[in-house]
């Protein structure tokens, strides 16, 4: 028996932020935007037997992450932009090729993301204190005295 593997990865980001916060810190105005991003990894496996036709199976795993992006005066502050929460991964398999199952898998991941929307928003709202601590650390390093 031989296995034929094909892998692919797709990232799906939410267009609008799930939460935004305006923060004033050390006489600087910051804008923090929080978005969810889904990444789906596909792996197509075909078992091949000498006397039978191959049977493709699409195995997939999706990860849902809440990302923070921060800007000051319209410029991104890369030092504090990062993923702040990862949800438990979602995985499954579909009979057939990954190309044929892609729309079904994307719909399942979208339902998973919608079901976690309230939790993602709550995580983003609770991040304010963490972000302020990170900005304090950056400010302490940049203050000359």
What are these regions (language model features)?
Residues 1-12:
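Sec-dependent N-terminal signal peptides
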Residues 12-78:
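N-terminal secretory signal peptides
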Residues 42-43, 48, 83, 98, ...:
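A generic structural signal for ordered alpha-helices
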Residues 75-96:
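A short, surface-exposed beta-strand/turn
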Residues 91-145:
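Compositionally biased, intrinsically disordered linkers/stalks adjacent to structured regions
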